[in-house]
From Swiss-Prot:
Entries under HAMAP family matching the protein: PurH
CDD domains listed in its UniProt record: IMPCH
Entry text on domains: The IMP cyclohydrolase activity resides in the N-terminal region.
The entry's keywords: Hydrolase, Multifunctional enzyme, Purine biosynthesis, Transferase
Pfam families: AICARFT_IMPCHas, MGS
Protein name, entry field: Bifunctional purine biosynthesis protein PurH
Organism phylogeny: Bacteria, Pseudomonadati, Thermodesulfobacteriota, Desulfuromonadia, Geobacterales
Species annotation: Geobacter sulfurreducens (strain ATCC 51573 / DSM 12127 / PCA)
UniProt pathway: Purine metabolism; IMP biosynthesis via de novo pathway; 5-formamido-1-(5-phospho-D-ribosyl)imidazole-4-carboxamide from 5-amino-1-(5-phospho-D-ribosyl)imidazole-4-carboxamide (10-formyl THF route): step 1/1; Purine metabolism; IMP biosynthesis via de novo pathway; IMP from 5-formamido-1-(5-phospho-D-ribosyl)imidazole-4-carboxamide: step 1/1
Length: 521
């Protein structure tokens, strides 16, 4: 590679740019610049040529046109090894530009502001910057292009080692980074503007351009032989595992993040009082609402103490010292997450240095719609997040549920949304007493829920049952009645609904149809 002799620098993020430009000047590199960047460099005592002087054409249209000129893009795109290109450049007085340092108008930071208007957003769509980046990246055989301040030092070190040049291998890697950056930038613009078409999140575009940034590299994925990283959605604001602040503990693993998400999203369903959700392998093994956070935890733990070992615990209220102490004294726990953590609770958990303690902030009662993605070989499935609870509540049996049964039914129904299908949840008094998850047969899930309750020493008699989908046969009802279930909530919609309802009537059970299924795979 030839020595770098001319650089064009125009940056919104000015991190490290002064030191970088000073070292370039030390190599005798001519510096071209625009606007605020030129002023910053010049005020620091560096020799700078304005791009308008380089092109012989002034900036115009309130700065919208600065670098969109053949002398700039000819200097970037001209191939130094192509005699025709070299002759054309010479004929038109186009001088080569060997290095481009550009980062873009802060579109995402602008639209993240609550007061941002459409006009504000439009004015922060960079045109000249991406154009220069793409031109330089296309001609990476001859041009070095930098979009990330983290790359300044490695490039300077390479120039020092080579007498002022940068290798083609480095240029190629930097060019790839540019196209990743401009794709993300355009995606952010597309997504923000697209949300204002009137169709919003319900619209499924021909091309999905959701943008995620890498937040964490992991030692391994779901299993030790799998690599993994955690990417977070750009501009996400709602309290979530992606936005949570880790107060202490080991680095979150792949499985920690997946399970913490399941626990937190489940506990968000309960606004009526202090609630606790304990999750193991993405399934709730204990859920309860109590008069205090400690009571909620005690009751959730009582559902399935065996499965709670090594679990993830989520709360919907500030974690207090008494609850933290009960957890640390009683069980091994991987992660605890809550909207807030009291200083006293933080001190208690600090005695268990490996416990990952997360603070996620509060969330609105009504969650915003968003998209769920599932990877399949060769594509992704995209759907609306399952935020609704039911379409209707219709009693279909002769017996009406009592007031307490209806409360228990709605509690169990909310839990069932977060249990892997086929899902059966037994509940009583605002706590789960048995959870049957992930079975291929619905009646087997019901049997497992009963076994779990018996194993935990909990009384099933007088409890209610929630099923995430309809009962295809009456056997699930017969099985539930045999262990003491008195009321059932399910979507309905089976060809044999009449047979299932008749079974409930035979057993004197109340049954409520919701008109809404909650499969979870």
């Amino acid at each position: 590679m030839a020595k770098i002799t001319r650089a064009l620098i125009s940056v919104s993020d000015k991190t490290g740019i002064l030191d970088f430009a000073r070292e370039l000047a030390g190599y005798g590199v001519e510096i071209l610049s625009t606007g605020g960047t030129a002023k910053l460099l010049r005020d620091a005592g560096l020799a700078v040529k304005d791009v308008s002087d380089f092109t012989g054409f002034p900036e115009m249209l309130d700065g919208r046109v600065k670098t969109l000129h053949p002398k700039v893009h000819g200097g970037l795109l001209g191939m130094r090894s192509n005699p025709d290109h070299v002759a054309t450049m010479k004929a038109h007085g186009i001088e080569p530009i060997d290095l481009v340092v550009v980062n873009l108008y802060p579109f995402e930071a602008t639209v993240a502001k609550p007061e941002c208007t459409l006009e504000d957003a439009i004015e922060n769509i960079d045109i000249g910057g991406p154009t220069m980046l793409r031109s330089a990246a296309k001609n990476n055989a001859d041009v070095t292009v930098l979009v990330d301040p983290a790359d300044y030092r490695p490039v300077l070190d390479e120039m020092k080692a080579s007498g002022g040049a940068v290798s083609r291998e480095t240029n190629f890697c930097l060019a790839v980074k540019v196209y990743q950056h401009t794709a993300a930038y355009d995606g952010a613009i597309s997504n923000w503007l697209g949300a204002r078409t009137g169709e919003g999140i319900a619209a499924y575009p021909d091309t999905v351009t959701l943008q995620f940034r890498k937040a964490q590299e992991m030692r391994y994925g779901e299993n030790p032989h799998q690599g993994a990283a955690f990417y977070v959605e750009r501009q996400v604001k709602e309290a979530s595992v992606a936005t949570a602040r880790q107060l202490q503990g080991k680095e979150l693993s792949y499985n920690n993040i997946a399970d913490t998400d399941a626990a937190l999203e489940c506990v968000k369903q309960f606004a009526e009082g202090p609630a606790c959700v304990i999750v193991k392998h993405a399934n709730p093994c204990g859920v309860a609402v109590g008069g205090t956070l400690l009571e909620a935890y005690d009751r959730a733990y009582a559902t399935d103490p065996e499965s709670a070992f090594g679990g993830i615990i989520a709360f919907n209220r500030e974690l207090d010292a008494d609850t933290a102490r009960a957890i640390c004294d009683r069980q091994f726990v991987e992660v605890i997450i809550a909207p807030a953590v009291s200083p006293e609770a933080t001190e208690v958990v600090a005695a268990k240095k490996n416990v990952r303690l997360l603070e996620c902030g509060t969330w609105p009662e009504k969650q915003q719609p968003r998209l769920d993605l599932k990877r399949v070989n060769g594509g992704i499935l995209v759907q609306d997040t399952d935020l609704d609870l039911y379409a209707e509540l219709k009693v279909v049996t002769k017996r009406q549920p009592t007031e307490q049964e209806m409360k228990d039914l709605l509690f169990a129904w909310r839990v069932a949304k977060f249990v892997k299908s086929n899902a059966i949840v037994y509940g009583k008094g605002n706590m789960t007493i048995g959870v049957g998850a992930g079975q291929m047969s619905r009646v087997n899930s019901a049997r497992i829920a009963a076994i779990k309750a018996e194993h935990a020493g909990l009384e099933v008699k007088g409890a209610v049952m929630a099923s995430d989908a309809f009962f295809p046969f009456r056997d699930g009802i017969d099985n539930a009645a045999a262990v003491g279930i008195t009321a059932v909530i399910q979507p309905g919609g089976s060809m044999r609904d009449a047979e299932v309802i008749a079974a409930a009537d035979e057993h004197g059970m109340a049954m409520v149809f919701t008109g809404m299924r909650h499969f979870r795979h």
